[in-house]
Structure formats: C-alpha cells, structure tokens
C-alpha cells in the first residue's frame, strides 16, 4: 500500500506531557486529540489507544512513550505522552530529549508531588526550554483559594529550578470531564462546554507561549537513535530516530556511531507518522531504512550522523550536581571508583568516576548529596558525546545526579 506523503505546511513543534503518576497526563493527551479532532486538527485517540502496551494496562501506569500528532490553527504538533512512574524516569529522559516544550500536569487536588519535582528537574537537565502548566482535576476542588494556593506552589517550584515561574501560563480544568463530554458529543466546538473550552484555552497558551524552535538544519546531520529498531525483510532495518540537527534524505550516506565499531551505510527510505518523507529535518522523529544493516547491528543510544562529523568517546570531564536525599537522590556520600549509569541522549552506559575536584580546585575525599562537583568519567563503551551535552546519573532506578559534559578527554 502506497503511503501518504507527510505535508509540511505549518511550523512543527514537539511537545509532551510530564508530571506525577496518576495526575492525568494520558487523559489530557486523549482530551487534546478529541478536542482538536472536532475541528479536523487531529485523529481522536482514546485513552486506551495511547496507554497501549500490555504491561501498562495491568498496572494502570504508562511505561513507554506514546507519540500522537495533532494540529492547531497555528502549528503542527508531535506529542509524547511521557511516563510518570518513578521506575520509568529513564524513559522520560529519552522522551523528553526531543521536546521543544512541555505541558506539566499537576492534580489540583494533590498539588505538586515528588515526581512533579523530578520531572521538572529532568526537563531542566535535558534542556526543555518552556513549560505550560495544566492544573487538572479542578472539578474536585470546590475552594477557589485552594486552587490559588496550588498554583502558587507550582510557580515557586518551577522558579526553584530556574524556570520563569511567575510568567508561566497556568490553565486549570478537568481532562476527564472534557474527555467524557467529548466521548458523548465528539463534534463539540469552542463555546459549547466549559471543560472542553479549558482544553482549547490550554492549547492557545501552548501556541502562544512555547516558541517555535529554530532548527539546526544547516549543521551536519545528527540523529539520536532511540525507541524502536525493526527489520523489514528484504529491505533492511528501520531505525526510529529523533533528528537533533541537520537534515536527511533518501540516498544520503551516513555513519552509525557509538557502542560498537562505526559503520557506514545508505539511507534507502524515510517516513514520519506512517507517511513517506522526502526530507527529515532537525526536530523530526523519523523512521529510517538503512541498507545492509541487520537488526542486531543497531541499538538504542547509537547515533546516525553525516560521515566524519562526530566521533565516539569514552572519557570526559563533567560539571555535575548530585541530588540531595530530599530531592530523591542518594542518602550517603560516594567515593572514587563509584560506578553508576550515565544516561546520555537515550543511552544508559555504565561508567566509573575516576576523580573529582571542587570549585576551589581542592580534591575532596568523597562527594556528598547536594554537592556540585567537577568529575572525570570513564565509560565502559564508546558513545557519541560532545562538549555541552547534558546527561543524568542514575542508580538503582532513580536519578542521583545531573550534569553537563565540560571537556572530552578520550
């Protein structure tokens, strides 16, 4: 079956929902698609369509990142519904790496919770530039003053992580009430239901507040490989990748870099949202068909790049902040030789911390939760890293630190 062509007629923006488990991220994602579907800007997606993997259903929590697309009058959006459960923050890091902005969902009934805090920190670390807040479950709060208190708390929390808390738009509503009404009245337009209007108001703020990103299309191609790799027998391997910069089209020669030896291959096909794509650009999430590459040659964390534009490395210096116990970090100090996981882009790689230096040049015996420190890291396998790249340090399923690559050593 011939695939429809992907039309690029509006600015394209990647956004996602972040926030604490059960605060309503997936319900809101479904409500947005149903609201915009009424005016032809989306294919309506039910909650169950978005929250689709079998293991998610049993536990009622989202594990992998679901991608949906929709349009407002202004822009075309790709939306990732990021996982909210603590075990899966790792996936949030891979989902959030591609976001130009995020909708932070906070339950008005509960206020900010531990994962709200962790997601804001991670959004800062992976470089999500703008956040708009949706105070969900407002139907469960009768007291207007209570709503204002929660709003104030959210603003203070955002400010504490260097987001402009005072300026960030906050819209309150109920994703579930909007979704229930739309399920019964799918053609509801603006002005016909208060709860649905709140979803329109949210998207107005997203349109206005989250800037259209300036894409790095003129730099050499760099695709971060993430999510799925699958084989189409006879044609090669399709790799899903988020294009960080540059552009890619069928026929381009590219290198597959990181984890294993560098391989050179040719792009023989490209698609996005199940439509064929003439040219992928920075900001797109694309499926690329690679000639002569087997499924087991490719894994998450590799990058696809213009030949000779980036090299894999195993040793670097980094500026790192180690989370305090109250922020969900370690309870105890660590010493030289500590071996956590380093999450770079979409890769988790074990590395050893060889040495550390404080701001004043001294070399402390140990690093205490809450310290900011310069450290030297030796990874167990090479990955494509560059100066200025951000990463998270994880241990036993939780984020214990966040940092930025200061200098490549080897």
UniProtKB/Swiss-Prot annotation:
Binding-site residues for GTP, renumbered to this chain: 19-26, 81-85, 136-139
Chain intervals for the UniProt region annotation (G5): 174-176
Positions of region (G2): 60-64
PROSITE patterns per the UniProt record, alphabetical: G_TR_1, G_TR_2
Family according to the record: Belongs to the TRAFAC class translation factor GTPase superfamily. Classic translation factor GTPase family. EF-Tu/EF-1A subfamily.
NCBIfam families listed in its UniProt record: EF-Tu (TIGR00485), PRK00049.1 (NF000766), PRK12735.1 (NF009372), PRK12736.1 (NF009373), small_GTP (TIGR00231)
Protein name: Elongation factor Tu
Organism per entry: Arthrospira platensis
The gene coding this protein: tuf
């Amino acid at each position: 079956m011939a695939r429809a062509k992907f039309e690029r007629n509006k600015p394209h923006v990647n956004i996602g929902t972040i926030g604490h488990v059960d605060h309503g991220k997936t319900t809101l994602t479904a409500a947005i698609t149903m609201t915009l579907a009424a005016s032809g800007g989306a294919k309506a997606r039910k909650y169950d369509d978005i929250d689709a993997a079998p293991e998610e259903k049993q536990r009622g929590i989202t594990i992998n990142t679901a991608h949906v697309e929709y349009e407002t009058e202004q822009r075309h959006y790709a939306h990732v519904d990021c996982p909210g459960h603590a075990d899966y923050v790792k996936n949030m890091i891979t989902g959030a790496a591609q976001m130009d902005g995020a909708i932070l969902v906070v339950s008005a009934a509960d206020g900010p919770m531990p994962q709200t805090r962790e997601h804001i920190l991670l959004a800062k670390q992976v470089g999500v530039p703008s956040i708009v807040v949706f105070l969900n479950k407002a139907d469960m709060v009768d007291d207007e003053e209570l709503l204002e208190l929660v709003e104030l708390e959210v603003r203070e929390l955002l400010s504490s992580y260097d987001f402009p808390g005072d300026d960030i738009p906050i819209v309150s509503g109920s994703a579930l009430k909007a979704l229930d009404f739309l399920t019964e009245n799918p053609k509801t337009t603006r002005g016909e239901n208060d709860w649905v209007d709140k979803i329109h108001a949210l998207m107005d703020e997203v349109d206005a507040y989250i800037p259209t990103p300036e894409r790095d299309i003129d730099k050499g191609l760099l695709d971060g490989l993430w999510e799925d790799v699958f084989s189409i027998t006879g044609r090669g391997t399709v790799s899903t990748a988020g294009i960080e910069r540059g552009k890619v089209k069928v026929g381009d020669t590219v290198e597959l870099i990181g984890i294993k030896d560098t391989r050179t291959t040719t792009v023989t096909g490209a698609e996005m949202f199940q439509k064929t794509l003439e040219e992928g650009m920075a900001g797109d999430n694309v499926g690329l068909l690679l000639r002569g590459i087997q499924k087991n040659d490719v894994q998450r964390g590799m990058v696809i790049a213009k030949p000779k534009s980036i090299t894999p490395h195993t040793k670097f210096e980094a500026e790192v902040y180690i989370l305090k116990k109250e922020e969900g970090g370690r309870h105890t100090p660590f010493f030289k030789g500590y071996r956590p996981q380093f999450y770079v882009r979409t890769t988790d790689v074990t590395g050893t911390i060889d040495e550390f230096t404080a701001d004043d040049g001294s070399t402390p015996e140990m690093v205490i939760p809450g310290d900011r420190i310069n450290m030297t890291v030796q990874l167990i396998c090479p990955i494509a890293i560059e100066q200025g790249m951000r990463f998270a340090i994880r241990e036993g399923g939780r984020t214990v630190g966040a940092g930025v690559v200061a200098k490549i050593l080897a």
